[in-house]
């Protein structure tokens, strides 16, 4: 690749825009992958009155927030805009943006938008009830969160928007467009629309034709790390970057997070522990799960895909437990100057493995085709306060998260025949040393913890550097920049104990799903169209 930019004696930096479900961040890195500064703002997605499950993305307000974050990051870093060598954007997957033929963004929804439940059900009936299977085999996605039912909903209920729509992109692509005026999507993020072929890494318009939808709205596809354009004069005035700064194609948050963790080779495995836990295994070539339990997404590394099995609301469940039951521990932790989770882990470390048999019922393993969960509960409690208390319940939650993670990894192994020899644990969950050790003991695998645990923005910055010609290869740079904090080695005796706990939990969870099926309890979450 020709070098578009050559660092001189002066110090240059890369900027990553990270558009998550709950916030937007502008993060500045130096060329060695060190985070220099960040600007961050929370955003909320709007429920439309009388549209159940809707979660619209406020294009005008959120662009203003993104610009504020870029200015804030530059201010916090204390550097002039001309020292930003390139910028790229990543975002939550599944969120889509529509544009009219003049290039004006006219409608967008967030990843969690579930308004199209009826359309999902209708689409499943197409082709003698085989349409969803056809979508999955080609794209690795089911219909529940794909773009197809959302577009059909617009055709049914907002025909004014549907008729105007000229182009579709993802939210990361929208940020790049607002900076540069250039429209394109990348495979890693666009792959979650259910419209992108895993093998060709390009659109499969026949799927829209089958659904009776327009196929003329598909934008150009460019690989992550490709130079898209430059920051326009108009955008520069708003965001504080210098006009002419290279804008580089970004991607999906999980895939770029894996790049930032150096998870770039076939069979490498990561557990990303945030609000959701993603269990991700790199596959050398596209293959899908015959049981349709696991989603398959394009990696940002061309030719490679990722099998991804998701645990639902894992981080959110821990936060609920802390906020609902641990007010005393929050006060004690504040006085001690430590994080509440650190105190709770210290308490939980005195509870024996297995947590006295307590079984949390929250997320199931992923069942992508029929994705729903049991009602949240704790099973097999004791009224002995020495055995059943906050420390026990907290440890049980950490153990259960690891058990669900192991189940998710197992079902990936079942269809891919890839059995990892170690895994990378990142995200907020990996800050917990007890949790990391429990994950090693439950999975039976060495667990490696990186120094940079929130690696999505770093992966995005690497893509920016490749597009600007600073780095020659995304994979090589990801491997070079990742640094390791610690490794947790599994204990064979505890692994055997947790195998028994896992078997019991799976049997109990099936019974709990039966209560939901009979309308006696309420599911933690149910996919649209079920």
Swiss-Prot record:
Catalytic activity entry: (S)-4,5-dihydroxypentane-2,3-dione + ATP = (2S)-2-hydroxy-3,4-dioxopentyl phosphate + ADP + H(+)
Keyword check for Kinase: yes
Single Gene Ontology MF annotation: autoinducer-2 kinase activity
E.C. no: 2.7.1.189
Alphabetized UniProt keyword annotations: Cytoplasm, Kinase, Transferase
Cell compartment(s), UniProt: Cytoplasm
GO cellular component, one term: cytoplasm
TM stretches of this protein: none
Function, in words: Catalyzes the phosphorylation of autoinducer-2 (AI-2) to phospho-AI-2, which subsequently inactivates the transcriptional regulator LsrR and leads to the transcription of the lsr operon. Phosphorylates the ring-open form of (S)-4,5-dihydroxypentane-2,3-dione (DPD), which is the precursor to all AI-2 signaling molecules, at the C5 position.
NCBIfam families documented for this protein: PRK10939.1 (NF008187)
Protein name: Autoinducer-2 kinase
Organism expressing this protein natively: Escherichia coli (strain ATCC 8739 / DSM 1576 / NBRC 3972 / NCIMB 8545 / WDCM 00012 / Crooks)
């Amino acid at each position: 690749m020709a070098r578009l930019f050559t660092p001189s004696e002066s110090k240059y930096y890369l900027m990553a825009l990270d558009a998550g479900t709950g916030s937007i961040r502008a993060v500045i890195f130096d060329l060695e992958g060190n985070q220099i500064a960040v600007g961050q703002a929370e955003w909320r997605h709007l429920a439309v009155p009388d549209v159940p499950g809707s979660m619209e993305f406020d294009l005008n307000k959120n662009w203003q927030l993104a610009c504020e974050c870029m200015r804030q990051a530059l201010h916090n870093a204390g550097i002039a805009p001309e020292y930003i060598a390139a910028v790229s954007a990543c975002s939550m997957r599944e969120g889509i943006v529509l544009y009219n033929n003049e290039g004006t963004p006219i409608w967008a929804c967030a990843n969690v938008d579930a308004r199209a439940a009826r359309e999902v059900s209708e689409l499943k009936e197409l082709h003698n009830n085989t349409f969803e299977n056809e979508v999955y085999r080609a794209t690795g996605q089911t219909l529940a969160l794909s773009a197809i039912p959302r577009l059909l909903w617009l055709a049914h209920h907002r025909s004014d928007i549907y008729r105007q729509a000229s182009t579709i992109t993802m939210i990361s692509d929208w940020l790049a467009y607002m900076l540069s005026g250039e429209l394109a999507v990348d495979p890693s993020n666009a792959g979650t629309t259910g419209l992108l072929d895993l093998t060709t890494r390009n659109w499969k318009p026949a799927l829209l034709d089958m659904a009776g939808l327009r196929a003329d709205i598909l934008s150009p596809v460019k690989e992550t790390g490709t130079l898209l354009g430059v920051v326009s004069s108009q955008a520069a005035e708003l965001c504080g970057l210098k006009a002419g700064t290279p804008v580089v194609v970004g991607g999906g948050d999980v895939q770029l997070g894996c790049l930032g963790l150096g998870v770039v080779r076939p069979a490498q495995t990561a557990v990303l522990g945030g609000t959701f836990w993603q269990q991700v295994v790199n596959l050398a070539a596209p293959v899908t799960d015959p049981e349709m339990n696991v989603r398959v997404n394009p990696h940002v590394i061309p030719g490679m895909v990722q099998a991804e099995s998701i645990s639902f609301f894992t981080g959110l469940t821990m936060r609920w437990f802390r906020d609902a039951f641990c007010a005393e521990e929050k006060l004690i932790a504040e006085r001690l100057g430590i994080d509440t989770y650190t105190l709770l882990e210290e308490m939980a470390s005195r509870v024996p493995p297995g947590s006295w048999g307590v079984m949390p019922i929250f997320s199931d393993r992923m069942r992508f085709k029929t994705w729903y969960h049991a009602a949240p509960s704790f099973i097999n409690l004791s009224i002995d306060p020495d055995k059943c208390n906050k420390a026990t319940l907290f440890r049980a939650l950490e153990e259960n998260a690891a058990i669900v993670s192991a189940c998710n990894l197992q079902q990936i192994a079942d269809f891919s025949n890839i059995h990892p020899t170690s895994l990378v644990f990142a995200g907020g969950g990996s800050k917990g040393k007890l949790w990391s050790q429990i994950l090693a003991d439950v999975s039976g695998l060495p667990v490696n913890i990186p120094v940079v645990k929130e690696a999505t923005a770093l992966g995005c910055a690497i893509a920016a550097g490749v597009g600007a010609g600073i780095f020659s290869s995304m994979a090589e740079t990801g491997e070079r920049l990742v640094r390791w904090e610690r490794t947790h080695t599994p204990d064979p005796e505890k692994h055997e104990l947790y195998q028994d706990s896992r078997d019991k939990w799976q049997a109990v969870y099936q019974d709990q799903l039966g209560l939901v099926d009979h309308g006696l309890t309420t599911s933690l979450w149910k996919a649209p169209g079920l």
